[in-house]
Amino acid sequence: MGRTVDADAGAVRFAYPGVSFFVRFEGTSLAMDAASTGVRSYLDVVVDGAVRTLHLDPVARRYVLADVLPPGVHTAQVLHRSETWHGTVTLTRFATDGGFVTPPALPARRLLFLGDSVTCGEALERTPPGPKQPVWWNPRVSYGMLAGAALGGQVQLVCHGGRGLVRSWDGRTDEFNLGRLYELAIADPGRPEGWDQRRYAPDLIVSAIGTNDFNQGLPEREAYVSEYVRLVRTLRRDHPQARIVLTEGAILDGEKKAALRAYLDETVRRVADAWVSRVVSRHYPGDAADAHPTREQHARMADDLVPQLREVMGW
């Protein structure tokens, strides 16, 4: 589940958060051969419901995911916790002392969440004091993943911390922002890998972007709306079966939140398509340690979003 790139000898490469692999095996142990291009990549390993977090090395090696299990059939999920800029992961193979059986089927419903660091789950598992740590990211319990689970759907996350629709948090316009991120499977500027949109046909696309665009002040309205219209029309072209929902996200408040909502309304008006709409996001301020929403706030964000998405989709 999520965007991957095929590599040599059956290996796969991936970088977006939330990319997941589901394995079912009959045996007493499970291992994985993998490596990252950086030193800040983390995975969650969920075996028969028990969760542990694994730190990846930049040198390829074997990781024991589970051992001394009771004989029988077991189910595992391996989920990428980290962002693209933490490192690109190569997963070469899984191994077991028994045999692999048919993995669990993914849900038929498909969701795509486009966004920034909030969608990536930045710092939602923070443990201050001290500086921010890469292990604090956890998309597994982010609002998008929680909403997808509540709606009975699989989820693909396309997100990058600090990025926006037209500019990054510091005002730069020469980095990959949302339109380019959407086109990529791996958004590493040194080695970008394209994504074939035919590989995943979402029923619902949720775009939660804008916080970083507004960090330096209000972006010029016409330029912003025009770019959003262009992106939405691209989404409709690539995925005519999908409903598209725009929302402003959780961090903005006050004048900036009101302005972004107005920009979104204007985007929806110009697109003039019944399959494109806007939903409301409440403000969640994070806490004293970090402005990103906490784990508990992500759960509330999902609770806010799910009824609105059910109404849009008729689910």
Where are these regions (language model features)?
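Active-site-proximal beta-strand/loop segments in catalytic clefts of secreted hydrolases
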Residues: 114-117, 158-162, 208-212, 247-251, ...
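Proline-centered loop/turn at the N-terminus of a beta-strand
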Residues: 110, 154, 242-243, 277
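Catalytic His-Asp segment of secreted/periplasmic serine-dependent ester chemistry enzymes
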Residues: 250-315
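Conserved SGNH/GDSL esterase-like catalytic core that processes O-acyl groups on lipids
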Residues: 16-18, 84-86, 124, 129-226, ...
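N-terminal secretory targeting modules
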Residues: 1-114, 118-139, 314-315
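Short coil-to-beta-strand
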Residues: 110-115, 199-208, 274-279
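Solvent-exposed, polar/charged alpha-helical surfaces in well-ordered, non-transmembrane soluble domains
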Residues: 141, 145, 149, 226-233, ...
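Short, conserved loop/helix-junction motifs that constitute active-site signature segments
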Residues: 106, 236-239
